[in-house]
C-alpha cells in the first residue's frame, strides 16, 4: 500500500543543515532517499500525485514533516530542521506538485486566427498595437475612444480611436527615474474626467547624482501627480503625494503603483522598495496603501491620522509589492494583488488600518531557495484570500464590468507576468469561490482592463503590444 507519508531518510549523517542551505539541498539530503530524487516516491509515497493520506493542506504537510510518524518510519524533523527550513520544504513540494499537475494540461492559448474556448465564454484576440510600444505598463480610456498607455521609460502614448499608435507622445511629463523595476507606471482618469480633465500618473520620483568618486547614484520612490492634457502637452500639474526625499532608496525593486478612485478619494500603492521591515514601520511610506482626497489632502478619518509617529495618509501596511488594485463595483470592497517572494503571491481584501504581514509572515521563500520565515500567520496580521505557489507574478487587476462577456460580469481578472496568464476569479461575499485560467502563453501580462466598449484590453511585455479579447461563438 502506497502510504502518503513524509518518511525518514535512511541514515542520520548530515541531518543538521545550515539555515541558509537552499531548499533543493535540504530535500536532497533529507528527503530524496525515501521520496525519490524527482518526488516520485519510494519507501515513502509520491509527493506530486495529489494523493495526500495525512492531510494535504500546507499546515498538514508542515506538521507531518515536523512531528513525523514513528509507526510509519518517519523521524520527527523539528529540532533537526528549523521551522524556516520546514516551511521552505512545504513551498518546494508545492512547486513540484504544481509542475507535475500542469503537464499535459491544455490551457486556453489565445490566437488571432482561432477561437479560444473557456468554461463560460469563447473568444478571439484582436491585435491593436504590436509595434512601436516600449515596455508598456498601464492603460486608461479617454471618452473619445482614444487610449493612454504609459511606457516604463517615461513616455505617455496615445492609441487612436481606430486602434493605431500615435507617433507623437505627450510632452512635459514629470521626470521619472527609469531604473530597475521603476519608471513611469500607472495612469488613470479621474471619475469626473469629462468635467474636470484630471489625469493621474504614478512614477518613480528621484534623482541621479554623481558621488565623490564620480559614480552615478540613483535614489527614488513612488510618487503621484495629476495634470491635464492639452493637445500633446501635459499642463496644470499638481502633486498628489510626493514623499520626503529622505525616503528615497537606491534599490531598483518593488515600486508598487496602482490607483483606485471612490467617493472623492484616491487609493494608491507604494511597494516596500526592498526594505522589507520598512513595510511594518508606519513612519515610512514603503509597503503601504494610501488613501487621500483626490486633491492630495489627508482625510480626517484615516486610521492613523491621530498617531504622531505615523504618516497620516496610510490606509493599510505590511505590503510587499502590490501591482494590482481594484474595487468591486457591487459593494465597493477594495482588493489588491501583490508579488510574494518565491511563492506566496497574494490576493488581499483591503480594509482600513490592517496589517498584511510582510515580511513577518509569508507563504513564500527567498528567490534563491533559502528559507525565509517559518510562520504563515500571526495574531493581528491578515491572511490573503488566496495565495499562489508557485508564483504567477501577479500584475494588473480589474473587475469585469462590461456587457460583451455577460457570464463573467463582476468577476475579477488577475494578470500574471511570469506565468503569462489571466485568471478569472469569482468572488462571492468577499471570498474566492472559483478561479479559471482564461488566457495563457501570449506574453507577460502587465495590465488587464475592461474597456468602455465591454472588450477586455491587455498589455503584454516581452513582445510589447496591446490586444483585446472579443467574444466569439456565444
Residues of each region from the PLM?
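Sequence/structural segment immediately N-terminal to covalent heme-attachment motifs in c-type
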Residues: 19-40, 53, 61-67, 130
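Acidic, Gly/Ser/Thr-rich repeat motifs that build Ca2+-stabilized beta-propeller blades
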Residues: 85-86, 93-276, 324-327, 333-336, ...
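Conserved blade-ending motifs and adjacent loop-strand segments that build the rim/top face
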Residues: 319, 431-452
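Electrostatic cytochrome c docking/interface patches
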Residues: 11-26, 255, 311
Amino acid at each position: 500500500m502506497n502510504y502518503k507519508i513524509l518518511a525518514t531518510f535512511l541514515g542520520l549523517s548530515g541531518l543538521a543543515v545550515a539555515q541558509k542551505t537552499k531548499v533543493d539541498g535540504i530535500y536532497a539530503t533529507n528527503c530524496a532517499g525515501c521520496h525519490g530524487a524527482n518526488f516520485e516516491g519510494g519507501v515513502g509515497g509520491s509527493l506530486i500525485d495529489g494523493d495526500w493520506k495525512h492531510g494535504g493542506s500546507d499546515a498538514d504537510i508542515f506538521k507531518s514533516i515536523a512531528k513525523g510518524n514513528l509507526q510509519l518510519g518517519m523521524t520527527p524533523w523539528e529540532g533537526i530542521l528549523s521551522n524556516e527550513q520546514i516551511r521552505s520544504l512545504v513551498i518546494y513540494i508545492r512547486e513540484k506538485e504544481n509542475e507535475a499537475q500542469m503537464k499535459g494540461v491544455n490551457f486556453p492559448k489565445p490566437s488571432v486566427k482561432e477561437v479560444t474556448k473557456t468554461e463560460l465564454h469563447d473568444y478571439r484576440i484582436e491585435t491593436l498595437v504590436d509595434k512601436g510600444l516600449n515596455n508598456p505598463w498601464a492603460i486608461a480610456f479617454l471618452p473619445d475612444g482614444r487610449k493612454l498607455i504609459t511606457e516604463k521609460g517615461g513616455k505617455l502614448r496615445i492609441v487612436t480611436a481606430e486602434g493605431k499608435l500615435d507617433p507623437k507622445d505627450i510632452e512635459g511629463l514629470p521626470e521619472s527615474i527609469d531604473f530597475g523595476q521603476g519608471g513611469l507606471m500607472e495612469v488613470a482618469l479621474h471619475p469626473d474626467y469629462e468635467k474636470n480633465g484630471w489625469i493621474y500618473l504614478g512614477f518613480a520620483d528621484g534623482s541621479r547624482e554623481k558621488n565623490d568618486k564620480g559614480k552615478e547614484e540613483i535614489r527614488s520612490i513612488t510618487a503621484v501627480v495629476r495634470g491635464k492634457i492639452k493637445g500633446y502637452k501635459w499642463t496644470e500639474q499638481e502633486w498628489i503625494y510626493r514623499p520626503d526625499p529622505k525616503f528615497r532608496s537606491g534599490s531598483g525593486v518593488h515600486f508598487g503603483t496602482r490607483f483606485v478612485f471612490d467617493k472623492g478619494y484616491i487609493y494608491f500603492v507604494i511597494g516596500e522598495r526592498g526594505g522589507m521591515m520598512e513595510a511594518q514601520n508606519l513612519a515610512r511610506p514603503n509597503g503601504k496603501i494610501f488613501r487621500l482626497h483626490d486633491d492630495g489632502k489627508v482625510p480626517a478619518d484615516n486610521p492613523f491620522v491621530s498617531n504622531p509617529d505615523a504618516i497620516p495618509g496610510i490606509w493599510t501596511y505590511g505590503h510587499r509589492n502590490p501591482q494590482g488594485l481594484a474595487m468591486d463595483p457591487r459593494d465597493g470592497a477594495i482588493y489588491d494583488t501583490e508579488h510574494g517572494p518565491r511563492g506566496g503571491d497574494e490576493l488581499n481584501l483591503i480594509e482600513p488600518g490592517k496589517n498584511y504581514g510582510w515580511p513577518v509572515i509569508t507563504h513564500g521563500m527567498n528567490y534563491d531557495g533559502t528559507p525565509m520565515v517559518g510562520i504563515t500567520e500571526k495574531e493581528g496580521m491578515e491572511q490573503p484570500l488566496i495565495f499562489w505557489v508557485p508564483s504567477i507574478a501577479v500584475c494588473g487587476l480589474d473587475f469585469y464590468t462590461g456587457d460583451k462577456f455577460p457570464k463573467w460580469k463582476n468577476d475579477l481578472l488577475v494578470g500574471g507576468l511570469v506565468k503569462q496568464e489571466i485568471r478569472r476569479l469569482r468572488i462571492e461575499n468577499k471570498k474566492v469561490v472559483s478561479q479559471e485560467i482564461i488566457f495563457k502563453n501570449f506574453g507577460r501580462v502587465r495590465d488587464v482592463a475592461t474597456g468602455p466598449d465591454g472588450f477586455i484590453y491587455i498589455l503584454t511585455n516581452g513582445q510589447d503590444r496591446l490586444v483585446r479579447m472579443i467574444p466569439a461563438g456565444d
